[in-house]
Amino acid sequence: GRRRLREGDGRHGLPVTAPAPRPTLEHLPIPLLAMPMGTGGVGLAWRQAHHALGVPAAVGEALLGFTALLWIALVALQALRAFRHPDAVLAELRHPVRVAFAAAPTIGLMIVAAFLHPHAPWLGAPLWGIAVTLHLLVAMLLLRRILAGRGEAAMLAPPLMIPFVGNVLAPVFGVGMGFVQASWMMFGVGIILWLAVQPLLLHRLFAGPPLPPGLQRLIAEATART
């Protein structure tokens, strides 16, 4: 954006601020990749409500179909962003908090696989396998970054659990597809990773540097409700 003074600003001593950056592909945030996790979770819950309570199945399937399209659109946009603006993507991956959202697309792909499996098992099952493999890779890379000391205190925030929750979530879908042994393996890996990361988060909460005021309020409200 332009940073030149407008005519008359200098004479009257008015503060001059640079205009906000225009919303472009370069500024598309990585945390948006978590959106399919929310819509897909509601869709899968509605599917179960159809079996248990008899609610209309079309609502859940429509939500899941929308989730699949949303996942494709967001991943495609981020891929295009990485091609056109690699420095912007690398900057987010170096961010201590936003890097955790790099695992969101693999969880979204698990949800898409669960949506497709009843309709096209030949497609849903392989997609689950691909999602699990990629998710394990992302989770291990993130854990390596933490244990190697490159994860500063700011990294130990609630979004850090996204990569590790996915390892426990994968069996929920995998067992129904027939991947019983692989699901047990993923569950075991998820528990081990949780045991490795949870103490770090608790130490950050009780003995680490003060949390940002906004995060303090969120944790206080969540604690008050329990």
Across the structure, where does each feature detected by a protein language model lie?
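Juxtamembrane helix-loop boundaries in multi-pass membrane proteins
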Residues: T17-A45, G60, L64, H85-I111, ...
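N-terminal amphipathic/basic-hydrophobic helices that include classical n-h-c signal peptides
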Residues: G1-P15
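Membrane-interface helix-loop junction between the first two transmembrane segments
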Residues: R47-V59, A76-V89
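Helix-coil boundary and interhelical linker segments in multi-pass alpha-helical membrane proteins
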Residues: W46-V59, A114-A125, A170-M185
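Structural signature of hydrophobic alpha-helical transmembrane segments
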Residues: A62-A73, W122-L136, S183-W194
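Alpha-helical transmembrane segments in multipass membrane proteins, preferentially the mid-helix core
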Residues: V138-L142, V172, A196-L205
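Transmembrane alpha-helix boundary signature
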Residues: Q78-P86, A114-G124, L142-A148
